[in-house]
Regions:
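Mid-chain, well-packed structural core segment of small domains
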Residues: 71-111
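Short, glycine-/small-residue-rich phosphate/pyrophosphate-handling segment
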Residues: 121-153
Length: 153
């Protein structure tokens, strides 16, 4: 499979999601990284977004709550190339009714080579990378052949 690139701008488009048990940890991480985060476009699911909007005192594009389709809305934006980063503090110890949505979101992020941070340590490494403040040519698999596999004769 061939590759192509998608240019991430200096201003990244970052999705922030946290399960209920992880919201305090994400909030603490956001407070610590406020200055850096405010240089970028932020997106979030509903409850997380409302909390973070109040904390950061900035506009965040807010989708539905995760269990009501918000995870899938963010996944769709990733597939469209409209989100560059996924910061998703999810709870590995609590079964959730929307576990399939979580798996689908993580899968779509991997398919489109979107950086994912699932805990504070990985989020710290991503946000502190020197690549955060510069353009970055993200390598993407070229799925054109895959998309046409059943339609060509």
């Amino acid at each position: 499979m061939a590759n192509k690139t998608a240019l991430m701008g200096q201003k990244k488009r970052i999705a922030l999601i946290a399960h209920d048990h992880n919201k305090p940890d994400l909030l603490e991480w956001v407070r610590f990284n406020r200055g850096t985060l405010l240089k970028h476009e932020l997106y979030a699911t509903k409850t997380t977004g409302r909390i973070l909007e109040k904390e950061l005192d900035c506009k965040i594009t807010i989708f539905e709550s995760g269990p009501l389709g918000g995870d899938q809305q963010i996944g769709a934006r990733i597939a469209e190339g409209a989100i560059d980063f996924l910061i998703f503090f999810w709870d590995p110890l609590s079964p959730l009714p929307h576990d399939p949505d979580v798996k689908a979101l993580l899968r779509v992020a991997v398919v489109w080579n979107v950086p994912i941070a699932c805990n504070r340590a990985s989020a710290d490494f991503l946000i502190m990378s020197p690549l955060m403040s510069q353009e970055y040519p993200r390598i993407l698999p070229d799925y054109e052949g895959y998309s046409k596999r059943l339609t060509t004769k």
